[in-house]
Every structure is written in C-alpha cells, then in structure tokens.
C-alpha cells in the first residue's frame, strides 16, 4: 500500500530511567522528540543522503528484530528526523547496529 505515514514521537513518561531512545543527543527530556517517516528502502535512502551531502546524525540502527532500520538526520533548523525502512540486505547496510536504549 502506498501513501504517507507520519509518526509524531512524544516522550511523555520517563519509563527508561531518563533515556530517550529516539533522540540523537545525550540530554533527555519529556516532550516531542522528532518526526519519523517510513521509507521504501534504507539502502537507497542512505545512498541519496550521501549523494546530497546530508549527514546522518545517528544510525543506521535497528531497535529489534522487526526487519527495519532507522537513520536520523537534522533539518536546517536542527530538528531531528527519523527515516525508517525495511532491511533488504543487512550486509549492504554499512555500520548497522542494534540500539539498546538501556545500555
């Protein structure tokens, strides 16, 4: 199914001992942390970011065995944007790591 999926990620309750698993900076606080967009291909997206000299601020990371990976970037106003897509081939995603928010 094609379309747009927008996720507004809010850290409203401190369930992770102050660790916000969805931000690319160490300081954690309640509130809106970032917006997330679903993409078709994490590999193609990473290639496009590189081609356009857009720095990945965190990632690629996977949060579990759901078959998806995320990269985080910053817009010109320094807002965090998550780009999340399926893992087509783990071996073709350089630097893919499992992100443990409690580590």
Q: What is the role of each PLM region?
A:
Residues 1-36, 46-74, 87-103:
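Vicinal oxygen chelate
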Residues 83:
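Conserved SAM-binding loop
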């Amino acid at each position: 199914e094609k379309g747009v999926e927008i996720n507004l990620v809010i850290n409203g309750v401190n369930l992770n001992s102050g660790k916000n698993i969805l931000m690319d900076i160490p300081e954690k606080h309640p509130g809106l942390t970032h917006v997330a967009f679903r993409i078709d291909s994490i590999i193609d997206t990473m290639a496009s970011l590189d081609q356009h000299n857009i720095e990945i601020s965190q990632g690629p990371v996977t949060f579990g065995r759901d078959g998806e990976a995320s990269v985080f970037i910053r817009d010109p106003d320094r807002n965090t944007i998550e780009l999340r897509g399926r893992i087509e081939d783990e071996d073709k995603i350089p630097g893919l790591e499992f992100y443990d928010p409690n580590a």
